Curated annotation (Swiss-Prot):
<keyword id="KW-0378">Hydrolase</keyword>
<dbReference type="Pfam" id="PF00692">
    <property type="entry name" value="dUTPase"/>
</dbReference>
<comment type="function">
    <text>This enzyme is involved in nucleotide metabolism: it produces dUMP, the immediate precursor of thymidine nucleotides and it decreases the intracellular concentration of dUTP so that uracil cannot be incorporated into DNA.</text>
</comment>
<keyword id="KW-0546">Nucleotide metabolism</keyword>
<comment type="pathway">
    <text>Pyrimidine metabolism; dUMP biosynthesis; dUMP from dCTP (dUTP route): step 2/2.</text>
</comment>
<dbReference type="InterPro" id="IPR008181">
    <property type="entry name" value="dUTPase"/>
</dbReference>
<dbReference type="InterPro" id="IPR033704">
    <property type="entry name" value="dUTPase_trimeric"/>
</dbReference>
<dbReference type="GO" id="GO:0000287">
    <property type="term" value="F:magnesium ion binding"/>
</dbReference>
<dbReference type="GO" id="GO:0046081">
    <property type="term" value="P:dUTP catabolic process"/>
</dbReference>
<feature type="binding site">
    <location>
        <position position="82"/>
    </location>
    <ligand>
        <name>substrate</name>
    </ligand>
</feature>
<feature type="binding site">
    <location>
        <begin position="86"/>
        <end position="88"/>
    </location>
    <ligand>
        <name>substrate</name>
    </ligand>
</feature>
<comment type="similarity">
    <text>Belongs to the dUTPase family.</text>
</comment>
<dbReference type="InterPro" id="IPR029054">
    <property type="entry name" value="dUTPase-like"/>
</dbReference>
<dbReference type="GO" id="GO:0004170">
    <property type="term" value="F:dUTP diphosphatase activity"/>
</dbReference>
<feature type="binding site">
    <location>
        <position position="96"/>
    </location>
    <ligand>
        <name>substrate</name>
    </ligand>
</feature>
<dbReference type="GO" id="GO:0006226">
    <property type="term" value="P:dUMP biosynthetic process"/>
</dbReference>
<dbReference type="InterPro" id="IPR036157">
    <property type="entry name" value="dUTPase-like_sf"/>
</dbReference>
Length: 151
């Protein structure tokens, strides 16, 4: 098991639990809204919500991914404003969550509400090699076909 250092940034996080796997099979750690009072998010509005914590991954072969909570999106229209978040191994600042209300009703976010999931992934480090063309013997069926090519 990999150890990731976590630091408390906001004192009011002591009122809530630290990120944790809710069930033994949970892939992500739940991140909570570290706010002191309820926050309204109007339809089509985006708000930046603090989690009250910072992490330091340190290992360059690991990154953190911030993912939305499916229930918030499905039932309330609350999704991540940037669709997905990336935490680089050398970032040490507070984890902030951009929440976007894509729904048609005002959403009230309460202190301590689970708002996103933090997932750690392995990173494959690569070195790019500039070429003038790809080997003609290595042609693929797809080739250069892009968006909608398999419809």
């Amino acid at each position: 098991m990999k150890i990731i250092n976590i630091k408390i940034i906001r004192n009011n996080i002591n009122n809530f639990s630290l990120p944790q796997h809710i069930t033994p099979g949970s892939a992500g750690l739940d991140l909570l809204a570290c706010i002191e009072k309820p926050v309204s998010i109007l339809p089509k509005e985006t708000r930046l919500i603090p989690t009250g914590i910072a992490i330091y991954i340190e290992d360059i072969e690991v990154a953190g991914i911030i993912l939305p909570r499916s229930g918030l999106g499905h039932y309330y229209g609350i999704v991540l404003g940037n669709t997905i978040g990336l935490i680089d191994s050398d970032y040490q600042g507070e984890i902030m969550i951009s929440l976007w209300n894509r729904g048609s009703n005002k959403f009230i976010l309460y202190p301590g509400k689970r708002i996103a999931q933090l997932l750690f992934i392995s990173i494959l480090r690569v070195k790019l090699s500039l070429v003038k063309s790809f080997d003609p013997f290595m042609k693929t069926i797809r080739g250069v076909k892009g968006f909608g090519h398999s419809m």
